[in-house]
Amino acid sequence: MIKIKRKTAPPPVEQDSDSDSSFDEEEPQDLEVQEGPVTDSSDEEAASSSKKTAKQGEASEDLKEEDDDDDEEENDDDDEEEDDDDDDDKKTRIPVLNPLSWMRNKEQRLALYKKMKKEKHKKKMQERRARRKAGVPANPGHTIESLREKDQTEVANLNDSDNEELQKELQLDDFSSYFERSYEPKVLITFADNPVTKTRKFGLELSRIFPNALVKIRNKSSVKKICKSAEREEFTDVVIVNEDRRKPNGLLVIHLPNGPTAHFKLSNVKLTSDIKRDHKEITKHRPEVILNNFTTRLGLTVGRMLGALFHHDPEFRGRRAVTFHNQRDYIFFRHHRYEFTKEGKRVKLRELGPRFTLKLRSLQEGTFDSKTGDYAWIISNKRHAMESRRRFFL
């Protein structure tokens, strides 16, 4: 290592004013160069500190590179999320501009609206024709029935091998003797105390529907007494029509002698005269009974109970058909007669009446007992307060 030492300059010499030159040339300074190792301790400490700082600098550069890579990855993810958010914002925030809203002239706006509506209908019909030509089925869309919550007790096919236990239960239930044809149904129809005219007419029309039915006035008797007297007179079922505000609003069906008892809400009652029909069109032939869409275990019991009110051998010559159609836990009742054309190739239905809708409120085991009776099923709350609107029980 080379060390350079600088000698100090001598003090300046005062010159006389009589000298010829105003400026004196400065003498060059001598520099001494020494060769050899440096023995100064401060230099060694500076060298070691420089090495340490170099190593620390390299380590810090490596950390900075890793941090930069992580920051770049995070920035890329943030950019992707921001792009997705921007796409969503673009989809939701862009308003749909209607050209009609910019027109102030009412006549021109109406003419343009009719033109746009006509073009839209024309385009829709073209798409429908193209779809039919290609053989593509139309989209059925969603309904409450298609979105219905699946019930664990749903019965798809009663004759299936998976439903052997259910078949054994049905062979031992309260309606097994009816389906074995061991007796002929006999129905007693009565009313609440002091029924109004419309309620009496409705009970009379029920007697035209149910074969072997008898209508009697209640005479302020309790339901238990009515059941005991009906059992003595060999009635198999009791139907009690309740009323409120001078309208029939409830139906109590009791199967004798051991129950069960079903309470229905009655609504949308239309008598034969209300649908402009004559009761003389209703013949005395035993009708054919159609039970539709009772798919659950509870629905199967209710359907068997309603079917047990009719004779098990219908008379097809009378061409009468009685339908109990369950839809969204509402049971729609219709009474028709099917008529053939002169050629005998086509058939049409003629409604005879009455027409009403049933809604199951409770199903009680045994005969009617409001105090100590056991309920197999009872409605819990109003429809709008239930936990799900897509859950049905029948």
UniProtKB/Swiss-Prot annotation:
Region Disordered, residue ranges: 1-98, 116-152
Main location group: nucleus
UniProt region (RNA-binding), positions on chain: 347-364
A GO molecular function held by the record: RNA binding
PROSITE patterns, per database record: BRIX
Recorded superkingdom: Eukaryota
Residues annotated as domain Brix: 185-369
Location in the cell: Nucleus, Nucleolus
PANTHER family: RIBOSOME PRODUCTION FACTOR 1, U3 SMALL NUCLEOLAR RIBONUCLEOPROTEIN PROTEIN IMP4
Name of the featured protein: Probable ribosome production factor 1
Phylogenetic lineage: Eukaryota, Metazoa, Ecdysozoa, Arthropoda, Hexapoda
